[in-house]
From Swiss-Prot:
Lineage, top ranks: Eukaryota, Metazoa, Chordata, Craniata, Vertebrata
Keyword Signal included in the entry's annotation: yes
Annotated keywords: Cell membrane, Developmental protein, Differentiation, Disulfide bond, EGF-like domain, Endoplasmic reticulum, Glycoprotein, Golgi apparatus, Growth regulation, Membrane, Neurogenesis, Phosphoprotein, Proteoglycan, Secreted, Signal, Synapse, Transmembrane, Transmembrane helix
Region called Interaction with GOPC, residue ranges: 447-465
UniProt name for this protein: Chondroitin sulfate proteoglycan 5
Organism: Rattus norvegicus
Membrane topology type: Single-pass type I membrane protein
GO cellular component, one term: extracellular region
Cysteine pairs bridged by disulfides in the record: 379-392, 386-402, 404-417
Tissue expression as described in the entry: Expressed in cerebral cortex and cerebellum. Expressed in retina (at protein level).
Gene that encodes the chain: Cspg5
Amino acid sequence: MGRAGGGGPGWGPPPVLLLLGVTLVLTAGAVPAREAGSAIEAEELVRSGLAWESRANDTREEAGLPAAGEDETSWTERGSELAAVGPGVGPEETLEASAAVTGTAWLEADGTGLGGVTAEAGSGDAQTLPATLQAPDEALGSSTMPPAIPEATEASGPPSPTLRDKPSLVPELPKEIPLEVWLNLGGSTPDPQRPEPTFPLQGTLETQPASDIIDIDYFEGLDSEGRGTDMGRFPGSPGTSENHPDTEGETPSWSLLDLYDDFTPFDESDFYPTTSFYDDLEEEEEEEEDKDAVGGGDLEDESDLLLPSQKPGVGPGTGQPTSRWHAVPPQHTLGMVPGGSISLRPRPGDPGKDLATSENGTECRVGFVRHNGSCRSVCDLFPSYCHNGGQCYLVENIGAFCRCNTQDYIWHKGMRCESIITDFQVMCVAVGSAALVLLLLFMMTVFFAKKLYLLKTENTKLRRTNKFRTPSELHNDNFSLSTIAEGSHPNVRKLCDTPCVSSPHARALAHCDNIVCQDDPSAPHKIQEALKSRLKEEESFNIQNSMSPKLEGGKGDQDDLEVNCLQNNLT
């Protein structure tokens, strides 16, 4: 370096570096490249390269502007050294040397970036590299060594001894650019925070996580074939028998469960204890259950009537129920078929009647209504048709009939037993009726009592007025006669009891009193006739008295008094 500082032109690198380079070239050509773990030799090469670079830079600065030939020679020597070092040294040494020249920071060979790289010198084959790689464009931009190598090769002067003995591999370096790039990429520092993706080998299937995608074989034959046809249908609906025929003429177990799962048997405890006529019905139900257990093939036809098919897109879980089972009060004339409707059974004495004609027609019989295309009884569709525990019956030509419940002190009435009559209501009606009768009797008693009181008051007033009347008022007043005519006899009897003044006409007075005091109803008429005849006699008698002398006047006055007394008695 001291010689270079003296300004001697054309001085090349020191001979120690040349010997080291020749040794490395020979070892690289005879022995395979070292592994990436040889970090000590790489460090030595980096140190020597740094020392050589500093010397060359100092020489160029002190020498000023040398000749073009000398400059080319010095750079040729430098380039030839690099060319000699390049093929003989492993790729890691080459990269480290280039990093020393370009100033790029590289990791050590035993770092995480080069842990998985294995390459042979000069082979150009890249093995599997780690995933923490930069983009190829970035690697090409960061590396400046490959374009400098061909320039040095073209500007080189006389070849070095190393180049004479062995052909230089400098032209082949551009072919190894991918390897260099990959090695540069491998030397970059990985991001510790970013996870490393894994790249599987070719030819091996990678296990993917479970997804929501379902195999298409499950939906095979959605249109018209396969098991997909039953997805939109309820078990037992029309169409299932064609796709899944019964193997031995027996329905599967699920059909029986779906048909009879919601069926509620009749429970006598729900009704009232009038169960004397249920014995025959229980026997009929047992016979029907035996027939259903033996003839299981008919259940499919019954399920077709019971469960009509739904729309294709609606499943059994989302659709509305097609039918419901309800507990129906049993009766002698009712026949309950599991898949059909409740209909009237013919009585033993009546001829059998076909119910299919009425069910298939437009109208249903009395007591039946159309539901889901079939005629069903009102008692079946509406379990609460009869209120207050009443029992619903179907009667021919009448329809639904409710038999109301009867208990102690409780009665029900109405067409559907909607009215309740309790013991309290009966008591209220009885007490109210008795109160009305008593009130009527009281009113009648008061009315007649008042009438009698008015009559008694009138009689009392009449008696008081008769005591204070003078004989002249009694003679001019006809009230006494009217009273006698009305049948009020007490006054007449009182007059009969009063004695009159004794007179010569005692015989006539006695006869007159006899007539008045009798209880004969025709007495008033007799009295009037007697008075008239008597008055005539008195008139004639009075005329005779007026013609008599005054001495006899005393006797005349006495006779007048007797006549007046008689008139008073008559009145």
